[in-house]
Amino acid sequence: MTANARIPARKLPLYRSLYVQVLFAVVVGVLLGHFYPEIGEKMKPLGDGFIKLIKMIIAPIIFCTVVVGIAGMEDMKKVGRTGGLALLYFEIVSSVALVIGLIVVNVLQPGAGMNVDASAIDTKSIAAYTAPGKMGTTTDFLMNIIPTTVVDAFAKGEILQVLLIAVMFGFALHRFGGRGTLVFDFIEKTSHVLFTIVGYIMKVAPIGAFGAMSFTIGKYGVGSLLSLGKLMGSFYLTCLLFVFVVLGLIARFHGFSIWKFVKYIKEELLIVLGTSSSESVLPRMMEKMENLGARKTTVGLVIPTGYSFNLDGTSIYLTMAAVFIAQATNTPLDITHQITLLLVLLLTSKGAAGITGSGFIVLAATLSAVGHVPVAGLALILGIDRFMSEARALTNLVGNGVATIVVAKWTGDLDTEQLKQRLDNPDWVAAQEPEAILDHKTERMDVSGSR
């Protein structure tokens, strides 16, 4: 069997499709939260439990994927080149997202005419987000990449810290050459076991999506959407514009269709829609990107790093929310103020993780740093932040997926034939049963023998 051999598709009954299961769960969650809000709020542990299950497996998966990818490479200089190109891409595209958010909010002006008195706003609800020290400086962010201990990084699940350890371990293992084969094989087999566990966890994804959506609608209600509908509509429109125009053009220039790519990750998008966290599908996205033809090393470096440096949806949200607050409170923002805001956001936006609520914390820190826009205005959008979090997470997910393919192509680590095959046939078996891919990989590994 060749490396590019196509896995025979197994047509599953519709009710066994993860996409259908999650879609059904989200709809039921919305209905329960709307008609029985008290019961809906009590469903929160279901969503929290699912995200905790995923988080417990993220650190070891990143470690194994990156170590195997780096240790198995012949040209070690390529690792540095891949990381450098990824950071360059992240900076350019996230900056474009910030600018697009700024342009759209100035054109549509969703906060104009609200005439809110900033001094009369009750700030008790946002006190937890605006407390001193909630978000550190750039130096703090960089220093936090270095863990206190190796165990501490894994215990806390700090993605960038685990990534640093994995890169160092991979380089060290590579230097051992043939003497490190036993360790290499153990880590590779372990990664297969971990992805099988992910397959088990994803079977309860519909329950997690149901619980999270029931809680969101039950706690915040549909009414909160209507009161600030113009901002919500503007934000969702901007995210769609960014995904299908900006990312669509990037995808087209690199030989694939954004529409086909979105269809390919439809299960992940629905899970993120339900949980409002792009982290909930991180392991599954790594597996799916690898099976699109991207090399393991590239996937292991780009996806985890992107969760801190390539949050396109969060970037759009930050500029739009900041200017919206200024418009709603009649705070004048001239071109100088807006450029200053943009420059500050270029730094603070890199401190947002791919978890629910992080964007709001970054926004609070940014408004405090800029000083011109009243921080009290955050209370205006607190009620709908959870709903906007869903669009942020969805955009972040698509953005990181596209980034992986683009960087893989730049570094020559992309099998374009496999990419085309997978996108043209998105209903392949791995979309429903990740463990089948692992069986396929094991079979290939047994045929090829050693690394």
Curated annotation (Swiss-Prot):
What is the protein's membrane topology class? Multi-pass membrane protein
Top-level taxonomic group: Bacteria
Membrane-spanning ranges: 17-37, 53-73, 85-105, 153-173, 193-213, 231-251, 306-326, 339-359, 361-381
This entry carries the following GO cellular component terms, namely: plasma membrane
* Alphabetically ordered keywords of this record: Cell inner membrane, Cell membrane, Membrane, Symport, Transmembrane, Transmembrane helix, Transport
GO BP annotation list: L-aspartate transmembrane transport
Q: Output the SUPFAM superfamilies linked to this UniProt entry.
A: Proton glutamate symport protein
Q: What would be one Pfam family of this protein?
A: SDF
Q: Which InterPro entries match?
A: C4_dicarb_transport (IPR023954), Na-dicarboxylate_symporter (IPR001991), Na-dicarboxylate_symporter_CS (IPR018107), Na:dicarbo_symporter_sf (IPR036458)
List the subcellular locations: Cell inner membrane
Molecular function, one GO term: fumarate transmembrane transporter activity
Gene3D superfamilies membership: Sodium:dicarboxylate symporter
Which family, according to the similarity comment?
Answer: Belongs to the dicarboxylate/amino acid:cation symporter (DAACS) (TC 2.A.23) family.
* Reported function: Responsible for the transport of dicarboxylates such as succinate, fumarate, and malate from the periplasm across the membrane.
Q: What is this protein called?
A: C4-dicarboxylate transport protein
Q: Which organism is it from?
A: Paracidovorax citrulli (strain AAC00-1)
Lineage, highest ranks first: Bacteria, Pseudomonadati, Pseudomonadota, Betaproteobacteria, Burkholderiales
